[in-house]
Amino acid sequence: MSTEGKSVIITGASSGIGAATAKRLAAAGAHVMLAARREDRLKELAAEIGPNASWRVTDVTSHNDMLSLGQAAMKHFGKVDAIVNNAGIMPLSPLANRRVAEWDQMIDVNIKGVLYGIDAVLSHMLERGEGHVINISSVAGLMTNPTSAVYSGTKHAVKAISEGLRKETAGVIRVTTIYPGKVNTELGLSIKDPDVLAGIGDRFNYKGLDAENIAEAVHFAIDSPRNMVLNDIVIRPIEQIL
């Protein structure tokens, strides 16, 4: 199935995996709706991509924002073929440090953001009889480690949501979950805990993937034949053990 002519919503599109995915899909002929909070970044990226890109300032933790995003994409493109729920944060910390505000923020962005993204397009996709939901999780959604209990919990939730959606919409909606390992993006900037920051260099002392590696996986999933779906894709740097 060709990506050309597809209409795709991408959240967290202002940088990293989201921006790389937007560029790759647009280069393959897709129409992309870029969603993020940073208007300046969205404008720059849309200008770089050209006429295949539109953008909308969106807070994924707002259900109304996400519903408006879906409606804007449908109005602009006439349809939505796929959504890439990519927005996420990773403020790692030990549970004993009680960074409760960060826990709440992770739940809002990493879990509710995915749910709101699905809700924004699901009725439309079911009415059309086809669609593709791609959720960007993490290898942390397949395990957990010290300091990542809450982050891993949110990513395990994404796995459960994806699997539930797949079973509820089997035969109509394609559902793909991508589990990246270390990727060279801004994700680590959300870590504020001084204990974690002090040891982060030793913990991740290997070369990460480029955002383009994950964008390639998204493109491959969208481009796969209509009668099949890549449900789970795990991508790690060759040196990453966990």
Kindly label every feature range from the protein language model.
Residues I118, T154:
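Active-site helix of classical SDR
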Residues P94-L95, E102-I107:
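Substrate-binding pocket helix/loop in short-chain dehydrogenase/reductase
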Residues A28-L45:
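Conserved glycine-rich Rossmann-like NAD(P)H-binding loop of the short-chain dehydrogenase/reductase
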Residues T177-I178, L197-I241:
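C-terminal helical subdomain
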Residues V57-L69, V100:
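The beta1-alpha1 cofactor-binding region of Rossmann-like NAD(H)/NADP(H)-dependent oxidoreductases
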Residues S14-S15:
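Conserved glycine-rich cofactor-binding loop
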Residues S138:
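Residue(s) in the substrate-gating loop at a strand-loop-helix junction
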